[in-house]
Amino acid sequence: MRSAVQWRLCWENDLQLTDHVELSDFFRKIYGRIGSFDAKPFEGGRSWAGARPEVRLIASDAQGIAAHVGILRRFIKVGEVDFLVAELGLYGVRPDLEKLGISFSMRMVHPVLQQLAVPFAFGTVRHAMRSHVERFCREGIAAIVPGVKVRSSRANVHHDLPSTRLEDVIVLVSPIGRSIDEWPPGDVIDRNGSEL
């Protein structure tokens, strides 16, 4: 049975403390399934793990938050080219709604990205999510950019670790204001900041 979800667009400054607490609980449950380390950033009512989103799309139903995606406009560097993207992150769907098609409702992200006037949307996922994101690619919503690593600043200072990390993740690019053919070549993407 499909849940009747309602999507809302929320700018970060419009969220109230109660919103952050509810989102924090949602993320601890979603990311806690991967491991307690992944849920840790969301303790204490914090609704972000690294960089804070600029805008969020939040789906809710009678049981609370059903799904979430965060968006942050930023300049990244691919090879020698700096350019604006909308980074997508903090993606999650409540477990009872997985495989019911709610992820396809994420298509409402595209009009928001068009309003933000970005050439591309960019996001990363773990390799374990490959089959999930390949569905979006088959429908032309996004393309997987193979053989690319992503360098990011760490969200917190750790005296025993370097200030940046280089990750081997799946890179997804969605053409918004330009053709996918205009995505610059390069084997490293520099976020020049923390992961969303």
Swiss-Prot record:
Instruction: Fetch the PROSITE patterns from UniProt.
Output: NODA (PS01349)
The molecular function terms in GO held by this entry are:
acyltransferase activity
Annotated Pfam families: NodA
Q: What is its EC number?
A: 2.3.1.-
| GO CC terms, sorted | cytosol
Which keywords does UniProt give here?
Acyltransferase, Cytoplasm, Nodulation, Transferase
- Alphabetical list of InterPro entries matching this protein: NodA, Nodulation_prot_NodA_CS
| Cellular localization per UniProt | Cytoplasm
Q: What is its main location?
A: cytoplasm
Top-rank EC class of the record's enzyme: transferase
Protein task: N-acyltransferase required for nodulation. Acts in the production of a small, heat-stable compound (Nod) that stimulates mitosis in various plant protoplasts.
- Family per similarity comment: Belongs to the NodA family.
Please give the name of this protein. Answer: Nodulation protein A
Q: Which organism was this protein described from? A: Mesorhizobium sp. (strain 7653R)
Q: What gene makes this protein?
A: nodA
